[in-house]
Every structure is written in structure tokens, then in C-alpha cells.
């Protein structure tokens, strides 16, 4: 009887261990681990502040609030923006995203987040992207010369 009880306990422990591993794998998938273009899919609101540094003259402050739609396939478009450059406000109309693209890669070790790049057009502006595994927020920094400009894009809808 003792032997039967021991075998039953061992079998139960093994079964629980196996189901725990299966659940961990399932949870990992739910968190969106692993980076791909589809990590960014939906409408985001981007808000950033910083400065542009002209070739001559002092640095000028700039800020933007912009709608960005990531299509989950490496393409994106802007649904419009408001920009302030040295206190001059401009409304920027929506664009169809022609020439706009982004790329994404896993950080090392995988599962810790993603890193990517974004180009609004062939001539810029260009950004480096830092993305948590679920892609709900994106930290962005402009990489064009003579710019000190960074902000966050937050997912607002799919």
C-alpha cells in the first residue's frame, strides 16, 4: 500500500510539473514574446519634445503630438499632427504613409523587448524604437543630425 501511495504521489507531481510547463509556454505566447513587424499593429498617439539645432544660431525648441497607424507589416501612416517649432504652431494633415516604414528585431536575450527603426520617408525624419514585448508603448528618439528629440507613442486602439 505504501509503495502504491508513493507511486501515486510521484505520478501526481510529474503531472503537475508537466502542466506547469505547458501553462508557462501558453503564458509566454500571450505576452507576445518574440519580436516581429506585427508587434506594432494599431493606432498610437506619439508625443515628443526636444530641440532642433540649426547650422547657425541657437537651438530651437520643438514638440509634436501625432497619430501614427502601424499596419503590422512594416508600413505606417500618419492620421495628422500638431507641431510647435520655436513657438510657431503648425497643423500637419494626415498622410497615406507613402515611403514610410519600420523594422523590428529581438533584443538579446529574446523576450526582453524589441528594438527597431522608423523612417517617415526616405529623407526622414528617422527614429530608433525601443519596444516592450507587448508593443503597447514605444519609446522613440530621433536619429537625424542636429536634433535632440524624444518621446513616447502609446497604443490607443487596434
Regions found by a protein language model. Give the residues of each.
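Mature soluble binding/inhibitory domains
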Residues: 23-158
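Bacterial N-terminal signal peptides that target proteins for export
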Residues: 1-10
